[in-house]
Amino acid sequence: MTPAPTNTPTAAVPTMFGCVSHSPLIAIRPKAPPQEAEILAHCEAFRAQVEAFRPDRILFFTNNHFAGFHYANMPAYCVGTRAFAVPDLGGAAGEIPVPSADSIALIEHLRSEGFDPGISYRMSLYHAVSQPLVRLIGAIDRYPLIPLFISVFTPPLMRFQRSRLIGEAVGRWIAAGAAAGTRT
């Protein structure tokens, strides 16, 4: 996990960035590894930073182990306008509050920059989303969340350069929101 609150140079409002892996085994293994206390302490420290930051929304990049996207419909990347967490491998279940107008605005921004994300009006998210949300912000429904799915398992995969360019475009959208007073 790499929490890194940053003030973007062009933004009037600070933005915050965090990155965390997940482990489905943390909820279903018989014995805790010796590193678990340290990992959970980092999660608690990050949660305190998020609470102090008071985000208006969270943008969450995620992948999927075929819990919500399957071979029959596997977009390279997709933005959710409504999302639900499924209770697999110890993950939390329930509706995730997605600010659909913000999701649509992100899609429109990405399209204006030459990207064509898929759109999901009912995105199923799995433990890779719900476990980190519970550990890092306390619950899956604590803050509005925009899910952005990127396929990392099903060939043909996007080239790394394309993924980076999408990330930069998302960053510009976040910076524009920050300039307008939205904390992401």
Predicted features by range, described:
Residues M1-T2, A41-H42, H127-Q131:
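Short amphipathic alpha-helical surface micro-motifs
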Residues D56-T62, L148, G181-T184:
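Beta-strand elements within well-structured catalytic alpha/beta cores of enzymes
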Residues I104-L106, R111-R164:
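Internal, conserved structured core segments that host functional sites
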Residues N73-A83, L133-I137, S163-G167:
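Short, surface-exposed, charged loop/turn segments at secondary-structure junctions
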Residues P3-H109, E113, P117:
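A short aromatic-anchored loop/beta-hairpin motif
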Residues M158-T184:
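Active-site beta-strand/loop microenvironment that shapes enzyme catalytic pockets
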